[in-house]
């Protein structure tokens, strides 16, 4: 466990260092200044690391978390917490982890592996016992961090997000902004010089909402029990093992400290496996070693002694050892000045209001200053958004890489052990300091550097400098060639070139596993403790990708500002600056073949969001126009590749998946600058259309509040997306009704009633459906922020439309003897009518047919730059070969499970084509490719077919037997060549039905003269007369019904009008084929904010109910 086990060591072996405290008492200052009860004029300011505190902010280990989360209960808890802090004169500032942190990637990989095992244990427990799992298996519900962030913003609690190195930014932000203490649970904070360190795991709010308690860690007590001076903590942390120098690289050193006579020494020679000593044993042994170091400034001598047993990559380990010391030295160094906005009148330790620093400096406590001093601050590294230090808060973290120890050991006053520190100078708890300390022992603590300005503080990145350099590349747009040894967007443009090749050097998998890199000459032949996982991260985990397209500087500035303020989904900044994201594990049954992994299910959403973020459609359209004007062929567009780190069935998190960004084919999405910063009504329309297109829900009914209330738009979009999955059926009829019924139930806003609701037997499938749905909500938040937030964040929050426990109860009721819809709505006819309307809106324009074969996995796309082995298989839209296919990936495999659906005209054609086997992940124009992609031979229609040439029948063939599943016979299949239909493609069988679910990235429309006529005809007809009758009936239906149309099944799955699509961006040079689909916003002249369909965002009755919920929760705690 390395340094991460130090926090648990404090809890178990240093009970005197863990003191319970009541935060309201600290805020009142009852024991400050000789015990005088003088109310402070400034609140007690606490910084909370949300990364360690999510389960406490959620409300604790309630058993409902396994069902997808009870978000209204969480909302009530946070409302009570905000009220308690406001009434108790406490100011909370919650800091979320928004950093990619490639330097800690190996820690994330290990954590994902453990959580994946926990998810399987949870599923097995629910399947066997039908009860909630124990709280020790707590796995945060999907999207929990973002829901907590939105809820805190709602209750006016200040939030922020880290951008590069979460731990360093939290420490720096705490010191620079005058916080009294830090609420967290991480060993990195315990080993840094934090003024007052409180436990995030022990944070509890009483039932009456008036007492907020936690525990304070007294690090001077920890140092006393270890008999180690705190100024040696940086070396101590570096030798325990950390994200820079992992404990696997220190295994030989740790075993050598124990010696051959130790009772555990026999464990180290077990069959050439990497066995690490127990964490508590290592901590004591390393503390003894560090205490006996004579000269802490001679790092070379220390490193030589530490790695004397190492037989491979010793020089690299020494470098990383020095970097680790520099990292912890920088975070442990106290600030020499404090921001002036903090220096306000507050009762000080002298019994009178005065100017006091946020924490008592070590000089005031007679604690000798640390000898691990940093050199002058390194040159500033430009931030991605512009000038250094600008943003919602300044950073002044020094660069740890070049740090060395301050030698001057002759006048060094430190002592090796803790016992030599004067007793009167040792740290005392905040609430126990009742007597003044002699101020003459230190310099003036109230002196403020006059040259200090918060906006111009130094800004440098953390130990991992990838983000800033990558952003600089994107701003400049330089066409720097990407190399095999560099990162995709970071070609030698970093402050520390060593970081590029070392990749923050760390191991990446659990002990005992075997990797190819662990074999060969680097391992040696007789190494007693093989360091199997000591290769640098980038060499065996990362994959080099081409540089990202340039992004406008103003867009990056806006992205950085919103990211730091906690106002934007963190994936967006990661994609724009680094081109990669990390996807967390959710509760999934890996033995269940019916439900796909969430990472694969919503990958098409992310692909289109990537295309929106990099403005693929507009940039490629401009390039094509320029080539057309110059009478040249359109250039070959290089793909935009995003790396996705994820762990699911059949996929290890140790290597990323390369995913291509896609652009919409139906319309040209404007560039990101216009989406985010445009003020025109047309821009607002485009934001909404881009979001709906990403979610495959670009239908008029989605914007009609009579069918879909605006606060339920995200719910309906996610459900519609799940229904359209081209693989096995995800949602059944009763499951879809259960989702809709619980969203309209009055119980959704009554968390007290839901707490009393009893679930007889948890449904394992319901738990997985909840996880899949919340994963879709997570991606909807991502898409909404990327498209410029067309839906206000207040209407995206899941407490408006989902409760896991309520969904479980509705699902059990719906699955039991096929309960009628009116009973599912508790006998409320109006609710049942609303559910019916919402279901029709979700299924609008979709036609379902039962498939004959299970959909196979499509092969990976043949992209340039990479070997085929670098692409793991994945679902989602796969780019067909250039200029070949007119195949589709339709919504098939359901057999009409959602009620009666109208399938006329092209929908009849689609239904017949799907029933006859022309349904798969994709299909090409040639039969061999089609059969290969569908995993089997196409079935022959039962009534046979005939071949016509120039209108004359020249051949017949017999049919096959009736297919399984009770389906009727297929209509007679006709293949016409030449004749009246001359000019269309050969054979009606290959009618280009436009795909519903996805489109390849480099697949561009090729118009032809009679495209509309072909798409309007059924692919199977007995004669030309049937075709004419079909067209006539089609045209009549299009006039009589607003929801039916003559066009093809457009890519968004909507009924279409047979007329050319209007020019979306006012351009006339688009040479693509006319679109025949009716979009929800197919004309920019349609207003978005003046339209009553969209103006209803602020007038929903659900909003008033949600406001009443907040008042009820606040009043309940009084």
From Swiss-Prot:
Q: Which residues carry this modification: Phosphoserine?
A: 960, 1023, 1044-1045, 1048
> Which coarse location class applies to the principal site listed for this UniProt protein?
cytoplasm
Point to the regions of Low complexity compositional bias: 376-396, 1038-1051
Citing just one GO molecular function, the answer is: RNA binding
Gene3D superfamilies this protein is in?
A: 5'-nuclease
Keyword S-adenosyl-L-methionine applies:
no
Q: Which InterPro entries match?
A: Coact_PPARg, PIN-like_dom_sf
Annotated positions of the Omega-N-methylarginine modification: 873, 884, 886, 982, 986
Residues annotated as carrying N6-acetyllysine in the record are 932
Q: Name one GO cellular component term.
A: nucleus
> So which disease is it linked with?
May play a role in the progression of scirrhous-type gastric cancer by supporting cancer cell survival during oxidative stress.
Quaternary context = Interacts with PURA. Interacts with SRC family protein kinases YES1, SRC and FYN. Upon tyrosine phosphorylation, interacts with PIK3R1. Interacts with IGF2BP1/IMP-1 in an RNA-dependent manner.
**Name of the protein described by the UniProt record:** Constitutive coactivator of PPAR-gamma-like protein 1
Q: Which organism is it from?
A: Homo sapiens (Human)
């Amino acid at each position: 466990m390395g340094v991460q086990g130090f926090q648990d060591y404090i809890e178990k072996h240093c009970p005197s260092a863990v003191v319970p405290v009541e935060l309201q008492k600290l805020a009142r200052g009852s024991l400050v200044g000789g015990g005088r009860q003088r109310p402070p004029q400034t609140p007690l300011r606490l910084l909370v690391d949300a990364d360690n505190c999510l389960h406490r902010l959620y409300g604790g280990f309630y058993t409902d978390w396994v069902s997808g989360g009870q978000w209204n209960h969480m909302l009530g808890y946070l409302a009570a917490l905000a009220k308690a802090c406001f009434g108790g004169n406490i100011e909370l500032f919650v800091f979320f982890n928004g950093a990619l942190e490639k330097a800690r990637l190996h820690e994330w990989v290990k954590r994902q592996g453990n959580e994946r095992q926990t998810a399987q244990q949870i599923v097995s427990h629910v399947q066997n016992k039908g009860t909630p799992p124990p709280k020790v298996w707590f796995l945060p519900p999907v999207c929990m961090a973002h829901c907590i962030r939105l809820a805190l913003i709602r209750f006016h609690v200040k939030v922020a997000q880290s951008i590069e190195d979460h731990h360093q930014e939290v420490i720096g932000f705490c010191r620079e902004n005058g916080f009294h203490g830090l609420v967290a649970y991480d060993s990195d904070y315990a080993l840094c010089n934090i003024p007052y360190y409180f436990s995030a795991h022990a944070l509890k709010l009483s039932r009456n909402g008036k007492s907020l308690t936690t525990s304070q860690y007294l690090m001077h007590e920890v140092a006393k029990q270890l008999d180690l001076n705190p100024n040696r903590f940086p070396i101590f942390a570096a030798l325990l093992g950390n994200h820079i120098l992992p404990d696997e690289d220190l295994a030989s050193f740790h075993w050598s400290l124990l010696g051959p006579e130790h009772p555990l020494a026999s464990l180290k020679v077990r069959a050439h496996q990497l066995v690490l000593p127990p964490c508590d044993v290592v901590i004591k042994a390393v503390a003894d070693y560090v205490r006996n170091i004579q000269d802490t400034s001679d790092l070379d001598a220390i490193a030589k002694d530490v790695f004397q047993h190492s037989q491979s990559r010793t020089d690299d380990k020494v470098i990383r050892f020095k970097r680790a010391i520099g990292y912890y030295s920088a975070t442990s160094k106290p600030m020499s000045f404090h921001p002036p906005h903090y220096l306000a009148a507050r009762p000080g330790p002298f019994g009178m209001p005065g100017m006091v620093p946020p924490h008592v400096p070590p000089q005031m406590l007679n604690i000798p200053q640390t000898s691990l001093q940093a050199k002058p601050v390194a040159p500033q590294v430009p931030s991605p958004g512009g000038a250094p230090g600008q943003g919602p808060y300044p950073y002044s973290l020094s660069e740890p890489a070049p740090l060395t120890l301050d030698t001057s050991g002759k006048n060094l006053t430190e002592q090796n052990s803790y016992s030599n520190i004067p007793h009167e100078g040792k740290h005392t708890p905040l609430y126990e300091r009742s007597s003044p300390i002699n101020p003459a022992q230190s310099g003036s603590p109230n002196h403020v550097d006059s040259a200090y300005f918060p906006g111009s503080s130094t800004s440098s990145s953390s130990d991992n400098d990838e983000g800033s350099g990558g952003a600089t590349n994107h701003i400049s747009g330089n066409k720097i060639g990407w190399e095999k040894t560099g990162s995709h967007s970071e070609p030698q443009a970093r402050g520390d070139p060593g970081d590029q090749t070392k990749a923050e050097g760390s191991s990446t998998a659990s002990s005992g596993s075997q990797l190819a890199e662990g074999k060969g000459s680097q391992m040696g032949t007789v190494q007693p403790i093989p360091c199997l996982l000591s290769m640098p991260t980038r060499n065996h985990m990362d994959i080099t990708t081409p540089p990202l397209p340039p992004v406008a500087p103003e867009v990056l500035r806006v992205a950085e500002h919103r990211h730091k303020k906690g106002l934007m989904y963190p994936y967006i900044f990661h994609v724009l600056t680094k081109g990669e994201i990390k996807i967390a594990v959710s509760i999934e049954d890996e033995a269940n073949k019916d439900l796909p992994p969430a990472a694969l299910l919503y990958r098409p959403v992310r692909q289109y969001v990537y295309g929106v973020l990099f403005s693929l459609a507009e940039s490629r359209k401009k390039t094509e126009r320029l080539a057309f004007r110059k009478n040249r062929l359109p250039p070959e567009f290089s793909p935009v590749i995003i790396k996705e780190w994820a762990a699911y069935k059949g996929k290890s998190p140790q290597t990323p998946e390369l995913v291509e960004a896609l652009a919409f084919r139906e319309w040209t999405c404007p560039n990101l600058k216009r989406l985010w910063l445009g003020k025109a009504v047309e821009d607002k329309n485009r934001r909404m259309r881009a979001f709906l297109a990403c979610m495959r829900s670009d239908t008029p009914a989605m914007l009609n509040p009579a069918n879909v209330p605006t606060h339920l738009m995200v719910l309906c979009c996610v459900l519609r997306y799940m229904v359209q999955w081209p693989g096995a059926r995800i949602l059944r009829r009763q499951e879809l009704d259960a989702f809709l019924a619980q969203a309209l139930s009055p119980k959704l806003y009554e968390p007290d009633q839901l707490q009393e609701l009893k679930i007889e037997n948890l449904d394992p499938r319901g738990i997985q459906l909840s996880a899949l749905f919340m994963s879709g909500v997570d991606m909807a938040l991502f898409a909404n922020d990327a498209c410029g937030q067309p839906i206000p964040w207040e209407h995206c929050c899941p407490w408006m439309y989902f409760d896991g426990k309520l969904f479980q109860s509705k699902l059990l009721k719906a699955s039991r003897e096929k309960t009628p819809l009116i009973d599912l709505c508790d006998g409320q006819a109006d609710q049942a009518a609303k559910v019916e309307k919402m279901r029709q809106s979700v299924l609008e324009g979709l036609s379902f047919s039962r498939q004959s074969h299970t959909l196979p996995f499509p092969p990976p796309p043949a992209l340039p730059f990479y070997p085929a082995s670098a692409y793991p298989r994945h679902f989602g839209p796969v780019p067909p070969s250039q200029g070949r296919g007119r195949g589709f990936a339709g919504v098939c495999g359901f057999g009409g499970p959602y009620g009666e659906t109208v399938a006329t005209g092209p929908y009849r054609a689609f239904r017949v084509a799907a029933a006859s086997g022309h349904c798969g992940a994709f299909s090409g124009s040639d039969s061999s490719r089609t059969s290969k992609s569908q995993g089997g031979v196409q079935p022959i229609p039962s009534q046979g077919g005939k071949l016509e040439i120039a209108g004359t029948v020249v051949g017949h063939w017999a049919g096959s037997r009736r297919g399984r599943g009770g389906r009727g016979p297929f209509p007679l299949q006709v293949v016409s060549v030449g004749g009246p239909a001359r000019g269309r493609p050969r054979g009606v069988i290959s009618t280009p039905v436009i795909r519903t679910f996805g489109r390849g990235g480099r697949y561009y429309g090729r118009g032809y003269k009679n495209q509309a006529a072909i798409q309007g005809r059924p692919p199977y007809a007995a004669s030309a007369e049937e075709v004419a009758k079909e067209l006539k009936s089609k045209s009549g239906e299009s006039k009589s019904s607003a929801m039916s149309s003559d066009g093809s099944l457009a890519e968004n799955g909507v009924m279409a009008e047979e007329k050319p699509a209007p020019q979306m961006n006012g351009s006339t040079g688009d040479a693509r084929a006319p679109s025949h689909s009716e979009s929800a916003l197919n004309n920019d002249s349609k207003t978005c904010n003046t339209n009553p369909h969209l103006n209803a965002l602020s007038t929903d009755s659900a909003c008033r109910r949600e406001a009443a919920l907040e008042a009820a929760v606040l009043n309940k705690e009084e």
